[in-house]
Amino acid sequence: MNSRIFPAAMSAPYAPLQPAVVVHDEQGRLYSAAYGDVYHSRDDAAGQAEHVFLRGNGLPQRWRGRARFTVCETGFGMGLNFLTLWQAWRDDPARPRRLHMLSLEGHPFAREDLLAVLRAHAPAGLQALATQLAAQWPPLLPGLHRLEFEGGALTLTLGFGAAQQLAPRLTARVDAYFLDGFAPRGNPAMWDPHMLQALARLAAPDATLASWCSAGQVRQALQQAGFAVRRAPGFGGKWHMTLGQRLPGVATPDDAPDDDGAPVLVVGAGLAGAAVAHALALRGRAVTVLDAARLAGLASHAGHAAAALTPVIARDDNPRARLSRAGSQRAWLRWRDLPAPAAPRRCGTVQLERDAGRAAALAQTLQILQFPADWVRMVDRDQAGALAGLPVARGGVFFADGMLVRPGALIDALLAGEGISTIAAQAARLRRHGAQWQVLDAQGRQVAQAPVVVLANAADAPRLLADSGLLEPLPRLARMHALAGEVTLLPAEALSGGPRCVVGGEGYLLPAVDGWCVAGSTYVHGAAQALTGAEGQRVNLDKAAGLLGQAPAAFASLQPGSLPGWAGWRAVLPGRLPAAGPLAHAPGLWLAAGYASRGLSWAALMGDVIAARLCGEPGPLETDLLAQIAPR
């Protein structure tokens, strides 16, 4: 099991994603005007996928008897290689338990276009799989997108953006390469030696490659990247294709998976801990969760009726914006199938701007980013009010993926997963004993032990590490502080039933849950306790009033101090980004903490970041983002 800390990568200038356009040539083949080339063979596209990429990599024979197998592809296109691979995996009774595909695509199709081209070009035997692929197809946003099929046994990690920028930022242990993409004459960047070397660094010791392209400069670049290459008979009208085998002695990825499937101990039963436990349990790991709140007969987020999950955007698409975008996508895909009331409600968020100047700057930001309008768009005051179902003070932006979440119900559902057990205990100290980490209580008694321990205990994590003599190498974590805050429950009838979507800005107002609308929130520095009270309710009522264009008369009659609410703590780190990953100085210890006010945005993503690295999967985040969140 590896605890490598990823170095920060230099940020490339932001370039908006340019979707593919559906064009056919005179022979009815799908064609790219940008690259002057067709998407598939003149003969049989699925036949080429099987001949070149499956047989060329010795599949399905090479994957038999393995626990996992990972494929890396350049040029996803319309996805026929993926669908052919998926079908071959389904048809093989000796298939690996888990199959992962990592595929890069600079110009992805929109969902409707993808479905249309697959309906037109995929064989009848792949149509059912094509429908499943289109159903999960992500919005056209730059970065990595993780899709799951077959109950999570098959994953597809899509990298949307320039391959030469994404390739150096991938984490995986690749067993087979499908080198596809348009011809080098029209798309030289896809076959650039530096790009191929960036992919080759991911190769497992016995990795193979196959490509329809047999150009001499491509074969030479692959040889320089550490592969023994040869030509083989091509498919259809092509005389040759290229096959390759990783040369012995060449450096291989140091992200070796934790193959023994050892149990994992998670310290903390809040949102961070529940999400880590859930992600690991979905992969078949046995997980024990230590829940300190249960010692006092409490439940995490008890009384917290509802919270919002809204992405953020930035003109330079900075790490916080990228992580937020990835986190909101991951949360929806991970939680949408949970039973009610745990499943999020995708109601959207109207985020109001403070003034006309900020609104103009935001409009310019959206023009630069060129994100899909069905993901985020500008709205004026009337449009915002129509979306919210009540008058609002200003216009702003509408995030279609904004969600309403019931935190307590979500945590309960995550911890109820098969393979997860919970112990009511407080972790006072950690102690290394052989290959195990032992958790001790305040009396020095062992509470639990495991070879892998994930600290997801929010602002108590620095204290636990300090008392265990493990905090000194983590100066950023040592600066974590707890910030109190409260939300207030407003009767929905005082708000004409409440908004239909999340309304945010200077504060937020949420749609009704069980007759109450949550308004928030306060930030109390230096508090000894997290409490509700008249002053906090006054702040939240003022924030709610500032969001509303014309508050109903019943709202004006609400009195601070007379309303129910909930108070809690935020664990805040410098930079307000979370910390998730292994502790380099303490092998076997991992951290998932510092989620501040964005626990819902970070939880599912950080859980999958940790679980993917423990289980030898392609990473769901780029290495420059992993460096930003690495515990330090």
From Swiss-Prot:
It is found in: Cytoplasm. GO terms for molecular function: flavin adenine dinucleotide binding; oxidoreductase activity, acting on the CH-NH group of donors; tRNA (5-methylaminomethyl-2-thiouridylate)(34)-methyltransferase activity. GO terms for biological process: methylation; tRNA wobble base modification. Its main location: cytoplasm. Its EC number is 2.1.1.61, 1.5.-.-. Transmembrane segments: none annotated. Residues 1-247 are annotated as: tRNA (mnm(5)s(2)U34)-methyltransferase. Keywords: Cytoplasm, FAD, Flavoprotein, Methyltransferase, Multifunctional enzyme, Oxidoreductase, S-adenosyl-L-methionine, Transferase, tRNA processing. Residues 267-632 are annotated as: FAD-dependent cmnm(5)s(2)U34 oxidoreductase. This is tRNA 5-methylaminomethyl-2-thiouridine biosynthesis bifunctional protein MnmC. It comes from Bordetella bronchiseptica (strain ATCC BAA-588 / NCTC 13252 / RB50) (Alcaligenes bronchisepticus). The gene is mnmC.
